Amino acid sequence: MEKLDKTASILSDIQMQLEELNTWKNGLVHTFNSLSKQIDDIKWHLEIDDIAEWKKIRFTGPPPSEYSYNIIKDMGGPFSAKPEPQDHVIIYAYTFYPKNLDGDKKYPLMVLVHGGIHGDFESSNADVVRNLIQQGYIVIAPEYRGSIGYGAVFYHLIDYGGLEIDDTHTARDWMLENCPQVDLERIGIMGYSHGGLHTLLNIFRYPKDYTAAYAGVPVSDLVSRLSYRWKGSPTDMGRNYGGKSPRDDIDEYRRRSPAWNAHKLEIPLLIHTNTNDRDVPVIEVESLITHLKAAGKEFEYKIYQEIPGGHTFERLDTPIAREARLEAYRFLAKYLKPENPP
Protein backbone atom coordinates (compact mmCIF):
# COMPACT_ATOMS: atom_id res chain seq x y z
CA MET A 1 0.00 0.00 0.00
CA GLU A 2 2.84 2.33 0.92
CA LYS A 3 4.48 1.60 -2.44
CA LEU A 4 1.26 2.47 -4.28
CA ASP A 5 0.94 5.73 -2.36
CA LYS A 6 4.52 6.62 -3.24
CA THR A 7 3.92 5.83 -6.91
CA ALA A 8 0.77 7.97 -6.91
CA SER A 9 2.69 10.84 -5.33
CA ILE A 10 5.43 10.59 -7.96
CA LEU A 11 2.87 10.54 -10.77
CA SER A 12 1.15 13.58 -9.26
CA ASP A 13 4.46 15.45 -9.13
CA ILE A 14 5.21 14.51 -12.73
CA GLN A 15 1.76 15.72 -13.78
CA MET A 16 2.34 19.07 -12.07
CA GLN A 17 5.73 19.43 -13.72
CA LEU A 18 4.23 18.65 -17.13
CA GLU A 19 1.54 21.29 -16.61
CA GLU A 20 4.19 23.83 -15.61
CA LEU A 21 6.25 22.95 -18.68
CA ASN A 22 3.20 23.29 -20.90
CA THR A 23 2.42 26.72 -19.44
CA TRP A 24 6.04 27.74 -19.96
CA LYS A 25 5.99 26.43 -23.53
CA ASN A 26 2.80 28.32 -24.36
CA GLY A 27 4.31 31.47 -22.92
CA LEU A 28 7.36 31.03 -25.13
CA VAL A 29 5.13 30.56 -28.19
CA HIS A 30 3.39 33.88 -27.58
CA THR A 31 6.70 35.60 -26.84
CA PHE A 32 8.08 34.26 -30.12
CA ASN A 33 4.96 35.37 -32.00
CA SER A 34 5.25 38.87 -30.54
CA LEU A 35 8.91 39.12 -31.58
CA SER A 36 8.09 37.76 -35.02
CA LYS A 37 5.36 40.39 -35.37
CA GLN A 38 7.78 43.20 -34.48
CA ILE A 39 10.31 41.93 -37.01
CA ASP A 40 7.64 41.63 -39.69
CA ASP A 41 6.50 45.19 -39.00
CA ILE A 42 10.02 46.33 -39.92
CA LYS A 43 9.78 44.38 -43.18
CA TRP A 44 6.72 46.45 -44.12
CA HIS A 45 9.03 49.45 -44.53
CA LEU A 46 11.06 47.57 -47.13
CA GLU A 47 7.97 46.37 -48.97
CA ILE A 48 5.82 49.48 -49.10
CA ASP A 49 7.62 52.72 -48.19
CA ASP A 50 8.31 53.69 -51.81
CA ILE A 51 4.61 54.10 -52.66
CA ALA A 52 2.70 54.41 -49.38
CA GLU A 53 2.59 56.08 -46.02
CA TRP A 54 1.54 53.58 -43.38
CA LYS A 55 0.90 53.50 -39.69
CA LYS A 56 -0.17 50.96 -37.11
CA ILE A 57 -3.09 52.28 -35.10
CA ARG A 58 -5.16 51.16 -32.11
CA PHE A 59 -8.86 51.42 -31.42
CA THR A 60 -11.40 49.68 -29.21
CA GLY A 61 -13.69 46.83 -30.17
CA PRO A 62 -16.59 45.35 -28.19
CA PRO A 63 -16.01 43.79 -24.74
CA PRO A 64 -14.99 40.12 -24.70
CA SER A 65 -17.61 37.45 -24.97
CA GLU A 66 -18.53 35.79 -21.70
CA TYR A 67 -16.92 32.56 -22.87
CA SER A 68 -13.65 34.30 -23.80
CA TYR A 69 -13.65 36.22 -20.55
CA ASN A 70 -13.97 33.01 -18.54
CA ILE A 71 -10.83 31.73 -20.28
CA ILE A 72 -8.73 34.83 -19.72
CA LYS A 73 -9.90 35.87 -16.26
CA ASP A 74 -7.23 33.70 -14.61
CA MET A 75 -4.53 34.90 -17.01
CA GLY A 76 -4.23 38.38 -15.57
CA GLY A 77 -6.30 39.96 -18.30
CA PRO A 78 -7.28 43.63 -17.81
CA PHE A 79 -10.94 42.96 -17.11
CA SER A 80 -13.25 43.13 -14.10
CA ALA A 81 -15.36 40.31 -12.65
CA LYS A 82 -17.42 39.94 -15.84
CA PRO A 83 -17.43 41.72 -19.20
CA GLU A 84 -19.01 45.15 -18.94
CA PRO A 85 -19.52 47.77 -21.66
CA GLN A 86 -16.45 49.70 -20.47
CA ASP A 87 -14.16 46.69 -20.80
CA HIS A 88 -13.49 47.29 -24.48
CA VAL A 89 -10.86 45.18 -26.22
CA ILE A 90 -7.95 47.09 -27.77
CA ILE A 91 -7.56 46.20 -31.45
CA TYR A 92 -4.60 46.98 -33.71
CA ALA A 93 -4.81 47.72 -37.42
CA TYR A 94 -2.50 48.67 -40.28
CA THR A 95 -3.42 51.75 -42.31
CA PHE A 96 -1.96 52.50 -45.74
CA TYR A 97 -2.28 55.72 -47.76
CA PRO A 98 -0.99 56.64 -51.24
CA LYS A 99 2.25 58.57 -50.82
CA ASN A 100 0.92 61.50 -52.82
CA LEU A 101 -2.40 61.67 -50.95
CA ASP A 102 -4.31 64.82 -51.94
CA GLY A 103 -6.06 66.28 -48.90
CA ASP A 104 -8.73 67.85 -51.10
CA LYS A 105 -9.74 64.63 -52.87
CA LYS A 106 -11.88 61.66 -51.90
CA TYR A 107 -10.52 58.12 -52.17
CA PRO A 108 -12.16 54.69 -52.04
CA LEU A 109 -11.44 52.64 -48.92
CA MET A 110 -10.56 48.96 -48.94
CA VAL A 111 -10.93 46.93 -45.75
CA LEU A 112 -8.41 44.12 -46.27
CA VAL A 113 -8.96 41.23 -43.84
CA HIS A 114 -6.29 38.64 -43.04
CA GLY A 115 -7.06 34.93 -42.85
CA GLY A 116 -6.28 32.19 -40.38
CA ILE A 117 -8.24 31.20 -37.25
CA HIS A 118 -5.23 32.53 -35.35
CA GLY A 119 -3.42 34.47 -38.07
CA ASP A 120 -2.15 38.00 -38.55
CA PHE A 121 -1.59 40.61 -41.25
CA GLU A 122 1.91 39.78 -42.45
CA SER A 123 4.17 41.53 -44.94
CA SER A 124 3.46 38.62 -47.29
CA ASN A 125 0.33 40.64 -48.10
CA ALA A 126 2.49 43.45 -49.50
CA ASP A 127 1.76 42.63 -53.15
CA VAL A 128 -1.98 43.04 -52.61
CA VAL A 129 -1.47 46.26 -50.64
CA ARG A 130 0.81 47.63 -53.37
CA ASN A 131 -1.74 46.77 -56.03
CA LEU A 132 -4.50 48.56 -54.12
CA ILE A 133 -2.37 51.63 -53.36
CA GLN A 134 -1.30 51.88 -57.02
CA GLN A 135 -4.95 51.82 -58.04
CA GLY A 136 -5.71 54.69 -55.66
CA TYR A 137 -7.23 53.05 -52.58
CA ILE A 138 -6.75 53.86 -48.93
CA VAL A 139 -6.40 50.55 -47.04
CA ILE A 140 -7.04 49.42 -43.49
CA ALA A 141 -6.16 45.89 -42.34
CA PRO A 142 -7.50 44.98 -38.86
CA GLU A 143 -5.79 42.62 -36.44
CA TYR A 144 -9.07 41.40 -34.95
CA ARG A 145 -9.27 39.55 -31.61
CA GLY A 146 -7.54 36.18 -31.69
CA SER A 147 -4.78 37.37 -34.04
CA ILE A 148 -1.28 36.28 -33.10
CA GLY A 149 1.57 38.54 -32.06
CA TYR A 150 -0.25 40.35 -29.25
CA GLY A 151 0.14 37.96 -26.35
CA ALA A 152 -1.78 35.08 -24.78
CA VAL A 153 -4.77 37.10 -23.55
CA PHE A 154 -5.50 38.58 -26.97
CA TYR A 155 -5.04 35.16 -28.56
CA HIS A 156 -7.71 33.63 -26.31
CA LEU A 157 -10.17 36.46 -26.94
CA ILE A 158 -11.03 34.79 -30.25
CA ASP A 159 -14.74 34.75 -31.04
CA TYR A 160 -14.96 32.97 -34.39
CA GLY A 161 -17.64 34.51 -36.58
CA GLY A 162 -18.84 36.57 -33.62
CA LEU A 163 -17.28 39.66 -32.06
CA GLU A 164 -14.23 39.41 -34.32
CA ILE A 165 -16.55 40.43 -37.17
CA ASP A 166 -17.45 43.56 -35.22
CA ASP A 167 -13.73 44.30 -34.82
CA THR A 168 -13.36 44.37 -38.59
CA HIS A 169 -16.40 46.60 -38.98
CA THR A 170 -15.07 48.92 -36.28
CA ALA A 171 -11.86 49.26 -38.31
CA ARG A 172 -13.97 50.51 -41.19
CA ASP A 173 -15.68 53.00 -38.89
CA TRP A 174 -12.36 54.16 -37.45
CA MET A 175 -11.08 55.07 -40.90
CA LEU A 176 -14.22 57.06 -41.71
CA GLU A 177 -13.94 58.97 -38.45
CA ASN A 178 -10.22 59.68 -38.74
CA CYS A 179 -9.49 60.08 -42.45
CA PRO A 180 -11.62 62.77 -44.14
CA GLN A 181 -10.27 61.72 -47.55
CA VAL A 182 -12.28 58.47 -47.45
CA ASP A 183 -15.35 58.50 -49.69
CA LEU A 184 -18.35 57.20 -47.72
CA GLU A 185 -19.95 55.99 -50.95
CA ARG A 186 -16.95 53.88 -52.03
CA ILE A 187 -16.08 51.34 -49.36
CA GLY A 188 -14.93 47.87 -50.32
CA ILE A 189 -14.00 44.81 -48.30
CA MET A 190 -12.00 41.77 -49.35
CA GLY A 191 -10.27 38.77 -47.84
CA TYR A 192 -9.15 35.20 -48.39
CA SER A 193 -10.12 32.10 -46.39
CA HIS A 194 -11.08 33.25 -42.87
CA GLY A 195 -10.73 36.78 -44.22
CA GLY A 196 -13.36 35.77 -46.75
CA LEU A 197 -15.67 34.76 -43.90
CA HIS A 198 -15.11 38.19 -42.36
CA THR A 199 -15.90 39.80 -45.70
CA LEU A 200 -19.15 37.91 -46.11
CA LEU A 201 -20.42 38.30 -42.55
CA ASN A 202 -19.60 42.02 -42.63
CA ILE A 203 -21.65 42.66 -45.75
CA PHE A 204 -24.48 40.46 -44.47
CA ARG A 205 -24.60 42.11 -41.03
CA TYR A 206 -23.84 45.66 -42.19
CA PRO A 207 -25.14 45.78 -45.78
CA LYS A 208 -25.48 49.57 -45.84
CA ASP A 209 -21.85 50.12 -44.86
CA TYR A 210 -20.12 48.59 -47.89
CA THR A 211 -20.27 49.20 -51.64
CA ALA A 212 -18.75 45.99 -53.05
CA ALA A 213 -16.98 42.87 -51.80
CA TYR A 214 -14.66 40.08 -52.85
CA ALA A 215 -14.30 36.75 -51.00
CA GLY A 216 -11.53 34.35 -52.05
CA VAL A 217 -11.81 30.68 -51.00
CA PRO A 218 -14.03 31.80 -48.10
CA VAL A 219 -14.91 29.72 -45.06
CA SER A 220 -18.66 29.50 -45.66
CA ASP A 221 -20.51 26.91 -43.58
CA LEU A 222 -19.33 26.08 -40.06
CA VAL A 223 -21.96 23.39 -39.58
CA SER A 224 -20.74 21.27 -42.49
CA ARG A 225 -17.12 22.37 -42.05
CA LEU A 226 -16.71 20.98 -38.56
CA SER A 227 -18.34 17.72 -39.57
CA TYR A 228 -15.47 16.88 -41.89
CA ARG A 229 -12.62 19.07 -40.60
CA TRP A 230 -12.68 18.49 -36.84
CA LYS A 231 -11.29 15.33 -35.25
CA GLY A 232 -11.21 16.45 -31.62
CA SER A 233 -13.80 16.19 -28.88
CA PRO A 234 -16.96 18.34 -28.80
CA THR A 235 -15.34 20.38 -26.01
CA ASP A 236 -12.28 21.07 -28.17
CA MET A 237 -14.52 21.80 -31.13
CA GLY A 238 -16.24 24.62 -29.35
CA ARG A 239 -13.10 26.29 -28.04
CA ASN A 240 -12.95 28.83 -30.87
CA TYR A 241 -16.68 28.88 -31.48
CA GLY A 242 -18.17 30.21 -28.25
CA GLY A 243 -17.69 27.10 -26.13
CA LYS A 244 -20.36 24.86 -27.65
CA SER A 245 -20.40 22.20 -30.34
CA PRO A 246 -22.85 22.36 -33.28
CA ARG A 247 -25.13 19.77 -31.70
CA ASP A 248 -25.33 21.92 -28.55
CA ASP A 249 -26.24 25.14 -30.36
CA ILE A 250 -26.84 24.66 -34.10
CA ASP A 251 -28.52 28.07 -34.43
CA GLU A 252 -25.43 29.88 -33.19
CA TYR A 253 -23.23 28.07 -35.72
CA ARG A 254 -25.64 29.06 -38.46
CA ARG A 255 -25.56 32.67 -37.27
CA ARG A 256 -21.78 32.60 -37.69
CA SER A 257 -21.90 30.90 -41.12
CA PRO A 258 -22.06 32.98 -44.33
CA ALA A 259 -24.03 30.30 -46.20
CA TRP A 260 -26.88 30.53 -43.68
CA ASN A 261 -27.00 34.32 -44.01
CA ALA A 262 -26.86 34.52 -47.80
CA HIS A 263 -30.38 35.97 -47.99
CA LYS A 264 -28.99 39.21 -46.52
CA LEU A 265 -26.81 40.04 -49.55
CA GLU A 266 -27.52 43.54 -50.87
CA ILE A 267 -24.31 44.63 -52.62
CA PRO A 268 -22.14 43.39 -55.53
CA LEU A 269 -20.14 40.31 -54.56
CA LEU A 270 -17.52 38.17 -56.31
CA ILE A 271 -16.52 34.73 -54.97
CA HIS A 272 -13.59 32.54 -56.03
CA THR A 273 -12.96 28.91 -55.08
CA ASN A 274 -10.75 26.05 -56.27
CA THR A 275 -11.74 22.41 -56.73
CA ASN A 276 -8.55 21.06 -55.11
CA ASP A 277 -8.71 23.27 -52.01
CA ARG A 278 -8.12 20.98 -49.02
CA ASP A 279 -8.62 23.67 -46.39
CA VAL A 280 -11.96 25.08 -47.54
CA PRO A 281 -13.23 22.34 -49.87
CA VAL A 282 -15.18 23.50 -52.90
CA ILE A 283 -18.30 21.78 -51.54
CA GLU A 284 -18.35 24.28 -48.67
CA VAL A 285 -18.22 27.29 -51.00
CA GLU A 286 -20.78 25.63 -53.27
CA SER A 287 -23.10 25.56 -50.25
CA LEU A 288 -22.78 29.35 -50.07
CA ILE A 289 -23.37 29.68 -53.81
CA THR A 290 -26.45 27.44 -53.59
CA HIS A 291 -27.89 29.49 -50.73
CA LEU A 292 -27.30 32.74 -52.63
CA LYS A 293 -29.01 31.38 -55.73
CA ALA A 294 -31.92 30.02 -53.69
CA ALA A 295 -32.40 33.49 -52.20
CA GLY A 296 -32.52 34.97 -55.70
CA LYS A 297 -29.40 37.08 -55.18
CA GLU A 298 -27.32 38.58 -57.98
CA PHE A 299 -23.61 37.92 -57.57
CA GLU A 300 -20.62 36.61 -59.49
CA TYR A 301 -18.47 33.57 -58.82
CA LYS A 302 -15.81 31.43 -60.43
CA ILE A 303 -14.90 27.86 -59.56
CA TYR A 304 -11.29 27.30 -60.62
CA GLN A 305 -10.53 23.74 -61.70
CA GLU A 306 -7.63 21.92 -59.99
CA ILE A 307 -5.32 24.93 -59.91
CA PRO A 308 -1.92 24.12 -58.30
CA GLY A 309 -1.59 25.70 -54.90
CA GLY A 310 -5.02 24.61 -53.68
CA HIS A 311 -6.21 26.91 -50.92
CA THR A 312 -3.47 29.49 -51.53
CA PHE A 313 -3.53 29.48 -55.35
CA GLU A 314 -4.59 33.15 -55.62
CA ARG A 315 -1.83 34.38 -53.32
CA LEU A 316 1.11 32.83 -55.16
CA ASP A 317 3.47 34.44 -57.68
CA THR A 318 2.10 32.58 -60.70
CA PRO A 319 0.31 33.71 -63.87
CA ILE A 320 -3.00 32.15 -62.78
CA ALA A 321 -2.75 33.81 -59.36
CA ARG A 322 -2.13 37.21 -60.94
CA GLU A 323 -5.02 36.60 -63.31
CA ALA A 324 -7.36 35.73 -60.42
CA ARG A 325 -6.31 38.80 -58.44
CA LEU A 326 -6.74 40.99 -61.51
CA GLU A 327 -10.27 39.66 -61.98
CA ALA A 328 -11.05 40.57 -58.36
CA TYR A 329 -9.54 44.06 -58.73
CA ARG A 330 -11.48 44.72 -61.92
CA PHE A 331 -14.72 43.58 -60.34
CA LEU A 332 -14.24 45.85 -57.34
CA ALA A 333 -13.13 48.78 -59.50
CA LYS A 334 -16.46 48.74 -61.36
CA TYR A 335 -18.18 49.87 -58.17
CA LEU A 336 -15.44 51.58 -56.16
CA LYS A 337 -13.97 53.55 -59.08
CA PRO A 338 -10.35 54.04 -57.99
CA GLU A 339 -8.36 56.68 -59.85
CA ASN A 340 -6.14 54.12 -61.62
CA PRO A 341 -8.31 51.03 -62.23
CA PRO A 342 -6.50 47.87 -63.39
Regions found by a protein language model. Name each.
Residues 19-25, 33-37, 73-78, 153, ...:
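Generic detector of short, locally flexible boundary/turn motifs and exposed helical patches
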Residues 51-185, 190-192, 227-228, 309:
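Cap/lid segment of the alpha/beta-hydrolase catalytic domain
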Residues 1-63, 342:
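N-terminal targeting or regulatory segments adjacent to alpha/beta-hydrolase or S9 domains
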Residues 3, 10-11, 25, 32, ...:
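Generic alpha-helical hydrophobic packing signal
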Residues 144-342:
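Active-site-proximal cap/loop segments of hydrolase catalytic domains
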Residues 13-15, 112, 270, 309:
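Intrinsically disordered, low-complexity regions enriched for glutamine and histidine
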Residues 43, 124-128, 199-200, 316:
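Short beta-alpha junctions and helix-cap segments that line functional grooves
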Residues 47, 76, 136, 296, ...:
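Short, flexible coil/linker elements and helix-boundary hinge sites characteristic
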